[in-house]
Amino acid sequence: MPVLLRAKAHGLVVTGKNLHYEGSLTLGRDIIEAAGFYPLEKVEVYNVTNGARFTTYVIPGRPGEVVLNGAAARLGEVGDVIIVAAYECVANPASHIATIAIFEGNKLKEVRKISLSDMY
């Protein structure tokens, strides 16, 4: 089965770092809901500011919060712009729909739903 993008939060800004936390990425519940992530879901993080890419999981936080925890805290700084993406194995790619949430300053600007048919 192909692995396709399921959910993406684009344009998030890191608001904090916690090196001595056990690990993960804290996202505000508002961000989790808008993008369609699940708590404890495995995600890929792409740091637009410095080019770092890493895998972690989501934990819910306060509205607007984007905190790099544990080892991930070494891969970004407060103020860095990041993209967070979740993928899934898809049995029927033709009917797959992904959610793309666009943020500015950690405030939701737009939500798009895209399908493979939108790509052709």
Curated annotation (Swiss-Prot):
Source species, domain of life: Archaea
Residues annotated as transmembrane: none
Gene Ontology terms for molecular function: aspartate 1-decarboxylase activity
Pfam families: Asp_decarbox
Active-site residues, record numbering mapped to chain: S24, Y57
Any single GO CC term annotated in Swiss-Prot or TrEMBL for this entry: cytosol
Keyword terms of this UniProt record: Autocatalytic cleavage, Cytoplasm, Decarboxylase, Lyase, Pantothenate biosynthesis, Pyruvate, Schiff base, Zymogen
Post-translational modification note: Is synthesized initially as an inactive proenzyme, which is activated by self-cleavage at a specific serine bond to produce a beta-subunit with a hydroxyl group at its C-terminus and an alpha-subunit with a pyruvoyl group at its N-terminus.
The keyword Thylakoid is annotated on this UniProt entry: no
In-chain residues carrying the UniProt-annotated modification Pyruvic acid (Ser): S24
Annotated catalysed reactions: L-aspartate + H(+) = beta-alanine + CO2
Pathway: Cofactor biosynthesis; (R)-pantothenate biosynthesis; beta-alanine from L-aspartate: step 1/1
Cofactor: pyruvate
Keyword Iron listed: no
Complex and partners: Heterooctamer of four alpha and four beta subunits.
Function: Catalyzes the pyruvoyl-dependent decarboxylation of aspartate to produce beta-alanine.
Membership in a protein family: Belongs to the PanD family.
Name this protein carries in UniProt: Aspartate 1-decarboxylase
